[in-house]
Swiss-Prot record:
It holds the Pfam family Ribosomal_L18p. This is one of the proteins that bind and probably mediate the attachment of the 5S RNA into the large ribosomal subunit, where it forms part of the central protuberance. Residues 9-20 have a biased composition (Basic residues). Part of the 50S ribosomal subunit; part of the 5S rRNA/L5/L18/L25 subcomplex. Contacts the 5S and 23S rRNAs. Residues 1-25 are annotated as: Disordered. It comes from Listeria monocytogenes serovar 1/2a (strain ATCC BAA-679 / EGD-e). The keyword Cell membrane does not apply. This is Large ribosomal subunit protein uL18. One of its GO terms (cellular component) is cytosolic large ribosomal subunit. GO terms for biological process: translation. Gene3D superfamilies: 3.30.420.100. Belongs to the universal ribosomal protein uL18 family.
Length: 119
């Protein structure tokens, strides 16, 4: 019998490998992305102090609506970049969370770059 590969388990292993190499500091925090089947979340994290500095998702009250999941991801990217600039954060380290840099993750990253975040 063929065993089915658990994609989320593989993603978590990949994410653990990446997280061992990158971490966010006060001067350059980590932009973390989490993607579920319906929603997308982004957090800017200072790993040294263990604090979330800014966050956004498509479940936020000031999000509005989006036509597609990729469109929602780009709006979340704009929102997290706006909230980061309000707190004086301009430069971050991008943590794609073990996901491929494609689709929703790419849309979020590009929208955040266009709205002033550098990575």
């Amino acid at each position: 019998m063929i065993t089915k590969i658990d994609k989320n388990k593989v993603r978590k292993k990949r994410h653990a490998r990446v997280r061992s190499k990158i971490s966010g500091t006060e001067s350059r925090p980590r932009l973390n992305v989490f993607r579920s089947n319906k929603n997308i979340y982004a957090q800017i994290i200072d790993d040294v102090n263990g604090v979330t500095l800014a966050s956004a998702s498509n479940l936020d009250k000031d999000f509005g609506s989006a036509e597609s999941k990729v469109d929602a991801a780009s709006k979340v990217g704009e929102l997290v970049a706006k909230r980061a600039s309000e707190k004086g954060i301009t430069s971050v380290t991008f943590d794609r969370g073990g996901y491929l840099y494609h689709g929703r993750v790419k849309a979020l990253a590009e929208a955040a770059r266009e709205n002033g975040l550098e990575f």
